[in-house]
Amino acid sequence: MKVAVLGAAGGIGQALALLLKLQLPAGTDLALYDIAPVTPGVAVDVSHIPTAVNVKGFSGEDPTPALEGADVVLISAGVARKPGMDRSDLFNINAGIVRGLIEKVAVTCPKACVGIITNPVNTTVAIAAEVLKKAGVYDKRKLFGVTTLDVLRSETFVAELKGLNVSRTSVPVIGGHSGVTILPLLSQVQYAKWNEDEIEPLTKRIQNAGTEVVNAKAGGGSATLSMAQAAARFARSLVKGLSGETVVECTYVEGDGKYARFFSQPVRLGKEGVEEILPIGPLSNFEQQALENMLPTLHADIELGEKFING
């Protein structure tokens, strides 16, 4: 099994490289790529950690050597948010970066499972899909927007608020990966009893948690460490699925289009990537209304990505 990280010298990428070196199964190959010349050094640095994961680093304009033979590709390349920016402000720069990298994936490892971390995920996943489609290699079972951080934050905040064991707290998060499109299904959390006045503030905190980090870092970055852990968890789940285990994660994929062309919901992962898209289950009145309210934003985000490629 080979996992490639594109954008491995960045704030998310370096932390992700460390976590994957520690957490991937023994015998996995880990390829680290970034345009920055420091990248082979990042690979040497993490290669000194004593685990049976083989690491190689690549830098320069062309990610092809890192992508050759890859089963899983994680894309975290791009610019990060700064105070006053929202994820859509990143679009102008990151859209072109994702397009260029996915064009290389389409040629070098078209059958790989691709996890998009680069924001705005609602839009960059649509860009990736259209690039792969133009190349004639699009398989919707193998393209994912990594929304796992919304799940991690939900689990953390719910466990803190309700005094639950965080390792046993599970919160499905549906929709997209920015602002109002992030919808934690708090009504489905086991062992949590909610007062009416708790739901909306907690939902808003989860939706705006990225901004909480950006502001707290005072211009010094965005959520890189927690995002890296989220991406590592998702990568491990993908690798388990590809190895024949049954794993369920919430992720942003192309499904039946009931709500939007791309939509985050629980997905059973397996040998072909998406094995089954699971139902979102019963919603509270608050959640049903929030779902309906988010859809125009989500549709517009997706359309932006489609138009970026198709004009």
From Swiss-Prot:
Active site (record annotation): 177
Sorted keywords for this record are: NAD, Oxidoreductase, Tricarboxylic acid cycle
- Residues reported to bind substrate: 81, 87, 119, 153
Q: What EC number(s) does the entry state?
A: 1.1.1.37
Residues that coordinate or bind NAD(+): 7-13, 34, 94, 117-119, 227
| GO molecular function list | L-malate dehydrogenase (NAD+) activity
Asked if the keyword Oxidoreductase belongs to this entry, the reply reads: yes
Name the InterPro entries for this protein.
L-lactate/malate_DH, Lactate/malate_DH_C, Lactate/malate_DH_N, Lactate_DH/Glyco_Ohase_4_C, Malate_DH_AS, Malate_DH_type1, Malate_DH_type1_bac, NAD(P)-bd_dom_sf
GO CC list = cytoplasm
Which PROSITE patterns does this one have?
MDH
Write down the chemical reaction(s) this protein catalyses: (S)-malate + NAD(+) = oxaloacetate + NADH + H(+)
Protein origin, superkingdom: Bacteria
What does the entry give for GO biological process?
Answer: malate metabolic process; tricarboxylic acid cycle
Give the record's family classification.
Answer: Belongs to the LDH/MDH superfamily. MDH type 1 family.
Q: How does it assemble?
A: Homodimer.
| Task performed by this protein | Catalyzes the reversible oxidation of malate to oxaloacetate.
Q: What is this protein called?
A: Malate dehydrogenase
- Species, as recorded: Haemophilus influenzae (strain PittEE)
Q: What is the lineage of its organism?
A: Bacteria, Pseudomonadati, Pseudomonadota, Gammaproteobacteria, Pasteurellales
